[in-house]
């Protein structure tokens, strides 16, 4: 009796695992893969935002609101796993996270490609990251004629 209950539990666990795996795989294929390794907002001391096409000034933010927004902004950099990035582009916006331990982590993107850990990847939701970063960090510079 006990052996049969264990078999049923294992069978049920396998079905749950396979179902969850299928849902996650379809979600990644449809919506894109999140960047892995983005720091937690609590571990970030400050961020430096750069937009060379608009201003030569590097903007540093230490307030919690901008730090949290910068970390959350990377959620719009989901990339297509099996799509080749557009070649020949250069980054428009770079966000550098300065961590509490002094290390830095940078992510760069243009409208179609994200550069993360030295590798270019095709952005699934094009335009969104650049538009939001302009509005959050460079609104004054972008709105000038």
Show the residue positions of the predicted features:
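Function-determining sites in protein domains
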Residues: 2-145
């Amino acid at each position: 009796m006990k052996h049969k209950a264990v078999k049923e539990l294992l069978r049920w666990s396998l079905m749950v695992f396979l179902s969850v795996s299928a849902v996650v795989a379809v979600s990644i294929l449809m919506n894109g893969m999140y960047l892995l390794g983005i720091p937690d907002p609590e571990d970030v001391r400050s961020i430096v935002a750069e937009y060379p096409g608009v201003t030569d000034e590097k903007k540093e933010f230490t307030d919690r609101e901008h730090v949290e927004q910068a970390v959350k902004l990377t959620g719009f950099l989901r990339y297509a796993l099996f799509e080749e990035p557009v070649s020949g582009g250069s980054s428009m916006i770079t966000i550098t996270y300065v961590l509490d331990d002094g290390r830095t982590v940078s992510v760069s993107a243009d409208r179609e490609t994200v550069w993360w850990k030295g590798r270019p990847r095709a952005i699934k939701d094009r335009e969104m990251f650049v538009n939001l970063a302009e509005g959050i960090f460079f609104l004054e510079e972008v709105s000038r004629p």
